[in-house]
């Protein structure tokens, strides 16, 4: 756990204790000062949570627990104001937690790795029950796991963003690689993990190209799935690269290629419990070609709809890109 976050949480707890004391003794001036300080500390805690990329579902769950505790304290100590306010916040937080954890969660696209379909500033809705429901803030499944399908645009935690993950978990088939390939992967993975890993991981959104048992090859912008070339047609070319329409599992989507990828030719045979995820912007995507497979253990959900486009704060939000994700 982050030391700064622990100190902030402990400070908030001390402030909360003082607030209860000043409320009981009817010392309004000190109570109001304590309330203001607690509010400012809470804002700093939220900033730290976002900096650490912690699961916001876990934050909501903790806030719900604190509201429930305050409700009980208010009732036991006879602090009517605390009891009423805590009761209201508790039910509001529980509803928000349930909606976000068990139905749909908003997610903002942070990079160009899924262009042209998903652009920086797109806000998408992630279906949290598409692959089975999990207890908020954890990887514990509450319902049976539903496996991702080829062509799904999935949100997940890639292995290199989790400090606890061993490189062999990212490539369980590493023993089947030759010495140069395995060493190259280990060096690349360890470097990425050292620079990007957190305790809670970082959410990525990519397209699932391979499921367990599949043999996948990428040759330039061509994808071969179990020995069959995935149909594609070149739509045109501009300063950003070649625009290609690809048809996978009977559904069409657009990809972009510049022909510059360092992993232009590679092949995988996907092991059990693992999935191959590639960005639609083929030469500008940090994906399975660099860090291996993602595990079904770290699935978050399926990105289904674009509901808002807001690339920068200097521009007004737009609904022009709203629609189902291809």
Model-derived regions: residue spans:
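Residue-level signal for well-ordered alpha-helical scaffold segments within enzymatic catalytic domains
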Residues: 71, 88, 97, 101, ...
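Aromatic-anchored segments of alpha-helical transmembrane domains
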Residues: 39-49, 96-102
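Soluble "head" domains of membrane/secretory-pathway proteins
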Residues: 1-33, 37-45, 63-67, 77, ...
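Internal/C-terminal transmembrane anchor helices
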Residues: 77-105
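Short charge-dense sequence patches
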Residues: 98-106, 250-257
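Membrane-bilayer interface helices and TM-boundary transition segments
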Residues: 104-114, 129
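Alpha-helical transmembrane-segment detector that highlights a single hydrophobic TM helix
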Residues: 49-86
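Generic hydrophobic alpha-helical membrane-segment signal
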Residues: 88-89, 93-94, 98, 110, ...
